[in-house]
Each structure stands twice: as structure tokens, then as C-alpha cells.
Amino acid sequence: MLQLWKVVRPARQLELHRLILLLIAFSLGSMGFLAYYVSTSPKAKEPLPLPLGDCSSGGAAGPGPARPPVPPRPPRPPETARTEPVVLVFVESAYSQLGQEIVAILESSRFRYSTELAPGRGDMPTLTDNTHGRYVLVIYENLLKYVNLDAWSRELLDRYCVEYGVGIIGFFRAHEHSLLSAQLKGFPLFLHSNLGLRDYQVNPSAPLLHLTRPSRLEPGPLPGDDWTIFQSNHSTYEPVLLASLRPAEPAVPGPVLRRARLPTVVQDLGLHDGIQRVLFGHGLSFWLHKLIFVDAVAYLTGKRLCLDLDRYILVDIDDIFVGKEGTRMKVADVEALLTTQNKLRTLVPNFTFNLGFSGKFYHTGTEEEDAGDDMLLKHRKEFWWFPHMWSHMQPHLFHNRSVLADQMRLNKQFALEHGIPTDLGYAVAPHHSGVYPIHTQLYEAWKSVWGIQVTSTEEYPHLRPARYRRGFIHNGIMVLPRQTCGLFTHTIFYNEYPGGSRELDRSIRGGELFLTVLLNPISIFMTHLSNYGNDRLGLYTFESLVRFLQCWTRLRLQTLPPVPLAQKYFELFPQERSPLWQNPCDDKRHKDIWSKEKTCDRLPKFLIVGPQKTGTTAIHFFLSLHPAVTSSFPSPSTFEEIQFFNSPNYHKGIDWYMDFFPVPSNASTDFLFEKSATYFDSEVVPRRGAALLPRAKIITVLTNPADRAYSWYQHQRAHGDPVALNYTFYQVISASSQTPLALRSLQNRCLVPGYYSTHLQRWLTYYPSGQLLIVDGQELRTNPAASMESIQKFLGITPFLNYTRTLRFDDDKGFWCQGLEGGKTRCLGRSKGRRYPDMDTESRLFLTDFFRNHNLELSKLLSRLGQPVPSWLREELQHSSLG
């Protein structure tokens, strides 16, 4: 029996193992079948989200304000001619949340501002320049810092506000230690704090209302339990926003009904002390406070810092015909698109969806989706159309312009075959590739194939923060800032929206999307084909947004085609026509959409910036003798210097600029540089240079400005300048403002570059002092080896070149040259080291007096920077003191 069991047992174990394996195989098969079924079956759709409805109840819900509203008073305009349009913002710290929110709104509105830490005793910043006010408005992040100023500072600030008609905005943020009820120090105003409120309403009688549409109710509880309300019997205070206590809140002290509307934002009309104010009983986290804040800024500045009511919006739908099966539009989706467009046209004049197509992907969806493609083409004349790339390829991947143009021609041929209009003059590159950073081939192909006049991108100057996005013009094409709206190719279902559907609704109802339209006169929104299929979130979002804007604002919404829209943009912001090129390698997103055939290693590590006639050409020559240093190739059109940052060459882009430099054999040890002596006194070069070359070292050479002026005059005579030939040097430098323009132009080129401290301050605005080297021009002339030693140390160049052995003074030339074998030398050209008569005494005395204050300011600046004072400057200051 035991032997039989030994025989049977292995067989039974084998069958059990087989059974387990069969069960596992069956389970895996079932799971695979289920996964296939789920992935291939149409998703059970929940009901489509309905756009947010019309405005909430606009009538009063309960009693109105505790006292009758004061009749509206016109704002007291600031003394326009006596104040700068700059806002002074007192913040608690550089990182405080409310302070950052205040600054973000000012920046988005393009208002100039200056931030200061809320002052302690006696720390009030300077408010005036002689009789001119520096600020048009004062904002306190913490109202108590204003109220509790020491007597001297408070008197100083209040007197300034009264004299210059400057208003104050203040925020009271309650915390757990705040008194529940207290009188605001020095004011007939009581505060009741740490309250829970509900049912917000705008007071239609508030004088400051501009963008805000009054008499609207925001029902429901307000977020948080730290709200403050204001009470006063003084006629100077007018409620702006009002709310009710939540049912569970204890009653507010005084004769106030529980159902009464309690002011959370009040406007001080200035009847108490002559200063108009707007006081907030909370921060800016609640959206309605942002809206009122913008109106308060406009009112208190007499509309000097004020946003216009006109808003232009354009909704682009990218990737038409592109998209995987299951995400594309069907016939019903196209019908809904047409229906919503018609509804929006009743609210937004001329509203038209703008469709961007890639023809290669036409009819690549399911049968239903292909029918949707046909439906779009059937109604093609109801929409605006613009080209993407034929195959949705990123343009920066095409290094050959003709190949790029061929791709565009395929898309254009598709458009012509299907009757798609091609005359809009607008295009968008997939992923904004090639628009910024500039891919020259894209701009050229766009113009040759499509006649493009306008494009848009979210990448200039950077994607984030969005409020910094700007426009520019390049190669005749206007580039507009493009905005996101929270909808991307993967956001296609309402209940699967990242962070939950409430996040989308919050963006629409006073959040990021609402603020984008509120604070930008022109908004081009990027959406995608998939946002209009499935749950049609694109339709939901923009219909809801438009209705919400019309409920709460007086904005006049409208749509323009891209070319008139771009023209309008640059009418509003003409200062943005010129771009500001930046280093593509400093932004990962930029580097990802920049040609891999390009390298930032071709950008220079240092610049010799001038000024002219100080010895910069000699430094260029001496540095070129160093094996680790390579100069830019000479320019055939601008006297060998590139002159990129201060001439029309700048608009040719950084590709043009980098073509003047070789690819270094070793980017870490090789030093590329350029010398353009006209850079020093240019108003635009420091900003442009710092944007593209933020880590570059800057070298300038300073000589006696009187000698520099005389040298320039003689230089112009040698080049046959008729003004220099017909006027003496003294006549040039002493010319009055009534003299001929050509004479005054030569005078400026002689004198203005010598305002050394003024120009250096401009450079130091954009570059840290550690990146700036000031070379003594007199030392360079008499002992160039010492100057070159300082330059090598400043740049960190290795190996170290001994210029004492390298340079030799040439008696015939009268200056230093490269020493060669056999006692020979290699020198600069014949135009360098030119000899001319000494300056006459009258001119020398005139210039000594003329440059005295400039030289004194230069001495002070060098002292602050810890840089040595050049020998010529010491001599000039000594002579001035003796005189």
C-alpha cells in the first residue's frame, strides 16, 4: 500500500500543478481580454458639462448698507505734472505672499513700481526730487505698518500725500492674536476681525468702480475665517464690497443686524484728513479683491495708471486633423462648435474660432472622426484658418530652408484642393518651434510660401511667469504673446481635469484665465482639436469665461483677425517692436526647440566696449597675440567691428551674430571676444548685452575725456569730415544749441562719450561690478604690459602671456607693437598712432571746466566700487582743486 502511495502521489502533485498553471493562464487571458475590451470600446460618456450660466442674482439679498450711501464724488486727480507714474509698495518682506500678489498685478498691468521693506523708525525712503514727487500712489501690504509709523515718518508721508494728491491703499490681515474689535489708530474707523462671512456684493455707489460691474452677488461662504469688516459713522468712508456674517458667527458689537451687509473694503474719500485711501479687510487671495484693487489703483491715480475697457481675444484651435483615434472631433462636435461660435458672437462682436491645420493627417481617425473632418471642411468658410506644418514637424529640425518650404507647400496645396482660405497672414509653428529662439529658415519660408505677417508664441521671453510674455517684430513678421488657458491635448474630460473640475472652474471664475483677460488688452489663447471633441472643454471654458466676464466687469470684448490684431498690439506697445535676444542655453525649453547644429559656445566671453579713441584697438591687437584668445571675424560693413548690439544688425538675430565667431576647440579654455568701441555710451547696449551675455566680462578704457574729445575731432578731420575741416576744435566744443545740426552732432560725439560716470552707471544697472574692468588709458599708453597683466587676471586666462617680452616700443610709429625676431615689429595700421598738433589752451581750459563735475562723479563711483583711480583722473582733480 505504501509503495502504491509513493507511485500515485507524484502523479497527483503533477495534476495539481497543471491545474494551478491552467488557472493562472485563464486569469491572465481574462485580464488581457478585459483590457482589450476596455481600450477598444467607446468610453461611457458622462453628461457634457454645461457652461456656467448667466449672472447670479444682482439684487440685494437682505438689507443694504447700514447707512445711506454717499453720492459719488469725482476722484481727486494727483498733481500729474508733479509726480512720476510710479507706485511705491511697502512690503513685509521680499517673499511675503501678499506682497508678491500686489507686485504681480502691477507687473501684469505694466505699471511701474518700486518696492521697499515697510520702514521702521526714521527709514522712510526719499519721496521727492526737489519739487517733483517720485510716486503717484502708495501701497501698504500691512496697514498697521502705516498706522503705527513714528510721528516724524507719518507726518512726512501724509504731508507728501496731501501736497501731491497721492492716495494710499492698505491691507489689514487678521491673525489669531488680532483684537476682535478695535479702533484704527488715528481714524474714526472701527475694525472687527477674524470673522466668517458669506454672500459678497459690490456697492453700486462706490466711486472707484471702473472695470467692476456693480450690483452683483457672489453667493456662498467666503474662504477662511480671518475676514475683517469696517464700521464708521464718518461720511468719509464709503463701502465698496459688503458681505453678511455666516449663521454661526457671533454678532458684531454695535447696532448691526445679523443680516446686514458689512463692509470688507472701504473707500476713504479724504474728508477726514485730505488723503484718499482704499482699505481692504483681507488680502488678494479672493478673486474679487483683485478686481477691486485694479479699480482702486485707477481711481487713486486719477486714471493715470488705468486699464482700458477694450479687450481683444482670439481663440486658436491647433492641430486640426491631428490626433490619435478616440480624441478627435465628430460631426456632433463640429455642430456644437458652430452653435457655440454663433452664441459667442452675440456677446463678443466678430468672434470666430481660428483653426490651425496639418493636412497630412486628414482622414486618419475613426470613421466617425473622418466624418467630423469632412464636416469641418463643409463649414470651412464659417471659421478662420491658419497653417501648422504639413506633417506637424517642428521647424527647428529643418536646417535646409528649401526642405522646410516644401513642407509648407504641401500644406498649402492641401488647403487649395479643399477650399480652405489661405489669406489670413497668420501661422503658428508646432510647439512654437523656431519662433523664439529664432530659426531664420522658418521666417524666410513663411514669407515666401504663405506671405505670413503674424505669428504667436508663449516662449518670448520665457514661458513662466506668463505675465512677462511680450511681443516683438522680426524679419517683417509680428510676433504676439500667446496665452495658455489650462487646456492641453490630454485635458479632454471634465471630471478628469488635473486637480479636479473645480480647478478649471476656479480658473474661469476669477482665477488665472479670468485675470489673463482682465489684465491684458490682447489675448491669443492656445487650444487643441481634442479640447473640442470628447467633453468639449474648449466650448465650456470660453463660453463660461465670456459670461463670467460680462457678469462682473464692464469689459468690451471683441475679436479681430490676426493682422489687425497685431497692428493694434504694437499701437498699444510700440516699445516692444524691438526684440531682446537672450541666450537659448539658459532656458531648457528654449534649448529644446533650438537647432542642434547651433551652439552657445560661439558666443563671446568678454566684450571690449570702448569708448572710441581711448586705446581699445590696441587692446584688441595685444589680446589677439594670446594663443587662448580669439577675436570675432572682421565685419566688412562697419569698420571691422561687428557693432551688433547698437545698430540695425541687432535685428538680424543671434544666428547672424554668432557667424562672426569660430567654434572654439575647447569651450572652457578658449576665450572668444569682440571689440566695438561704440558700445560704451549707447543707451541700449548694456541691457541688450546683459540679456544675451549675462556672464560676459566687460572691459572699458578711460582716458582724460578732454584728450579723447580732441582725438575724435582730429580723427574726423583725417577722414575728411567737412564739419571738422571747417570749424576749429574750440568752435565745435563750445557750439550753442542754435548752431547747425551737423555741428552739434560732431560736438556730441566729442563730448558725450566723456560722461564716464553716467555711462558706467548704466552698465552697472545690468552687470555686477565684478564683471566690469576699467583700464587706465594713460597706463595703457605708457606701460601696456602692466595693463595686459591686469586684463589677463581679470579674465582668468591661461596660460599667462608675458607682454613685457611680447611688446616693443616702435620709435618711428610712436607706440607699442609686437616684437619680432631681428628687432623687427608688427604694428597697427597707419591710421593708428597718428600725430597731430597739441590742443590749444583755450580748449583745454574749457574742457577742464566742462568735465569737472563728470570727473568728480567718476572718482566717487570708483571709490564705491573699490577700483583704483586712474592717474589722469588724479591729475585732473588736483588741477581742478588748485583752480
Curated annotation (Swiss-Prot):
Determine if Cell inner membrane is one of this entry's keywords.
Answer: no
Q: What is its main location?
A: Golgi
Region of interest: Disordered: 49-81
Compartments it resides in = Golgi apparatus membrane
Keywords of this protein's UniProt record, alphabetized?
Disulfide bond, Glycoprotein, Golgi apparatus, Hydrolase, Membrane, Multifunctional enzyme, Signal-anchor, Transferase, Transmembrane, Transmembrane helix
Question: What is the catalytic activity of this protein?
Answer: alpha-D-glucosaminyl-[heparan sulfate](n) + 3'-phosphoadenylyl sulfate = N-sulfo-alpha-D-glucosaminyl-[heparan sulfate](n) + adenosine 3',5'-bisphosphate + 2 H(+)
Q: Which residues form the active site?
A: 613
Q: Give this protein's Gene Ontology molecular function annotations.
A: deacetylase activity; heparan sulfate N-deacetylase activity; heparan sulfate N-sulfotransferase activity; N-acetylglucosamine deacetylase activity
Binding sites annotated in the UniProt record for 3'-phosphoadenylyl sulfate: 613-617, 711, 832-836
**Membrane topology term:** Single-pass type II membrane protein
Top-rank taxon, per record: Eukaryota
Q: Which cysteines link up through disulfide bonds?
A: 817-827
Enzyme Commission number(s): 2.8.2.8, 3.-.-.-, 2.8.2.-
Residue ranges annotated as compositionally biased, kind Pro residues, are 65-78
What are the annotated glycosylation sites? 233, 350, 400, 666, 726, 802
Q: Which GO terms describe its cellular component?
A: Golgi apparatus; Golgi membrane; membrane
Q: In which pathway does it act?
A: Glycan metabolism; heparan sulfate biosynthesis; Glycan metabolism; heparin biosynthesis
**Which residue windows are transmembrane per the record?**
19-39
**Region (Heparan sulfate N-sulfotransferase 2) spans which residues?**
598-883
The record's subunit annotation is: Monomer.
Q: Any miscellaneous information on file? A: The presence of 4 different heparan sulfate N-deacetylase/N-sulfotransferase enzymes in mammals, as well as differences in their enzyme activity suggest that some initiate heparan sulfate modification/sulfation reactions, whereas other later on fill in or extend already modified heparan sulfate sequences.
> According to its UniProt record, which protein family does this protein belong to?
Belongs to the sulfotransferase 1 family. NDST subfamily.
What does the protein in this record do? Essential bifunctional enzyme that catalyzes both the N-deacetylation and the N-sulfation of glucosamine (GlcNAc) of the glycosaminoglycan in heparan sulfate. Modifies the GlcNAc-GlcA disaccharide repeating sugar backbone to make N-sulfated heparosan, a prerequisite substrate for later modifications in heparin biosynthesis. Plays a role in determining the extent and pattern of sulfation of heparan sulfate. Required for the exosomal release of SDCBP, CD63 and syndecan.
What this protein is called in its record is Bifunctional heparan sulfate N-deacetylase/N-sulfotransferase 2
